């Protein structure tokens, strides 16, 4: 059935109530009324769709669910963090670890949301895994509130004050590493989108020397909050930042950092800047007069344009 991420009423698996949740119960009533085409524009003549489906946790929407393991971690301060993880095939060698920090929409107590909300499953794809010859993937989930960049008083922070989750999150990551001897402690890479991108910088700069590289996206971390020591550390620390010019967050976080890294002559800072967040799958196209509207004619070759904040779709 031809649908797109921008359409409404098409039976989305998630509902958004401040953050994403499984649509449960998931019930559909679908009838064929007029011409319907598949994604390759073949005409559908009949439908046979179950009216009630239990989507949660069984791989119906995304078979990769079955490759992740979910658990919880209790930190020494009492924080309980849900997380999901992927284990590569045993190969008698050290493996890298990739840590993903979700955005505001994927918090809660079901880590499936944290790795499905932004297609983090791409990190376990053959294409991505081949770059590391197999890598562990760890997806922590912030269990409450607005998400990772919140200080001890419950206020949003872009770096001026430390995240209340800083130490419990680091403890989870470090415990995961030390309990798996085949993880290469010299190849721990951390990335994340939106407020997860804020937290990437919080973690890197509060535990300098621990992470090997970082890949933040579409964040609002304020480079003006860092110390001279931290700024000097970033001068050589490997970072690849991704953002769009169509995202207001870019002008608070990503772009000022790019400018500062150029100013100080950073030697290992890289970035991908896009005009907007357009579809890269080749499946969805926009109306020629307005690419933010889905083209249903099958004739447009202009990629569908998403919200400018969705830089993770370009990763």
Predicted segments with their positions:
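The conserved beta1-alpha1 loop
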Residues: 101-103, 218, 243
């Amino acid at each position: 059935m031809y649908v797109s991420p921008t359409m409404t009423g098409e039976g989305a698996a998630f509902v958004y109530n401040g953050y994403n949740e499984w649509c449960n119960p998931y019930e559909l009533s679908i009838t064929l009324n007029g011409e319907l085409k598949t994604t390759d524009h073949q005409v559908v003549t009949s439908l046979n769709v179950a009216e009630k489906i239990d989507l949660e946790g069984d791989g119906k929407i995304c078979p990769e669910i079955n490759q992740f393991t979910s658990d919880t971690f209790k930190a020494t301060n009492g924080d309980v963090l849900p997380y999901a993880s992927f284990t590569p095939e045993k190969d008698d060698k050290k493996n890298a670890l990739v840590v993903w920090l979700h955005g505001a929409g994927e918090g809660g107590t079901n880590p499936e949301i944290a790795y499905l909300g932004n297609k983090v499953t791409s990190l376990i794809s053959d294409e991505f895994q081949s770059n590391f010859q197999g890598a562990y993937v760890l997806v922590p989930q912030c269990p409450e509130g607005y998400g990772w960049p919140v200080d001890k008083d419950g206020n949003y922070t872009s770096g001026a004050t430390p995240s209340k989750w800083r130490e419990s999150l680091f403890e989870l990551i470090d415990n995961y590493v030390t309990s798996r001897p085949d993880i290469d402690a010299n190849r721990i890479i951390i990335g994340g989108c939106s407020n997860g991108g804020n937290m990437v910088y919080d973690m890197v700069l509060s535990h300098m020397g621990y992470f090997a590289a970082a890949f933040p996206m579409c964040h609002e971390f304020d480079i003006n909050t860092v110390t001279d020591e931290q700024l000097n550390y970033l001068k050589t620390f490997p970072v690849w930042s991704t953002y769009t010019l169509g995202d207001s967050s870019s002008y608070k976080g990503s772009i000022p950092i790019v400018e500062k890294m150029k100013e100080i002559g950073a030697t290992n800072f890289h970035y991908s800047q896009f005009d907007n967040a357009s579809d890269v799958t080749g499946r969805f196209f926009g109306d020629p007069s307005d690419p933010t509207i889905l083209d249903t004619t099958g004739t447009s070759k202009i990629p569908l344009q998403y919200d400018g904040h969705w830089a993770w779709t370009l990763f």
